[in-house]
Amino acid sequence: MQSLAWQPLAEGAERAVLYGDPTHAGPFVLRFRTSREIAIPLHWHRHDEHITVLSGPFSLAVNGERDELETGSYVVIPAGAHHSTWYGAGTLIQVNGTGPFESIYVDQPH
């Protein structure tokens, strides 16, 4: 077993690839962790996104309905569903999906 190689995403957020390559077709497993509060604006993905909350505060709004998810929670966000996410300091989530994994932001031209 290897230790995770964490890569910075934004100030206070990091990502590690556990399995696969999210930039190519096929299954992948990622982990995201935060050291401060972070909000990800409204976006969607071309494939289903499976999220497991491993620790810390995490909330999710899918198609306008916001839910606070507790440690151990699991949710599937269907492909094409518009959603926003909020991470508290110390949050750790795992994302399973099928690549290529791309976030398409609603307020940006694509």
What are the functions of these language-model segments?
Residues 35-38, 45-63:
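Glycine- and acidic-residue-biased ligand/ion/polar-headgroup-sensing regions
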Residues 7, 86-110:
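Double-stranded beta-helix
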Residues 37, 58, 63-82:
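Short acidic-glycine-tyrosine-enriched beta hairpin
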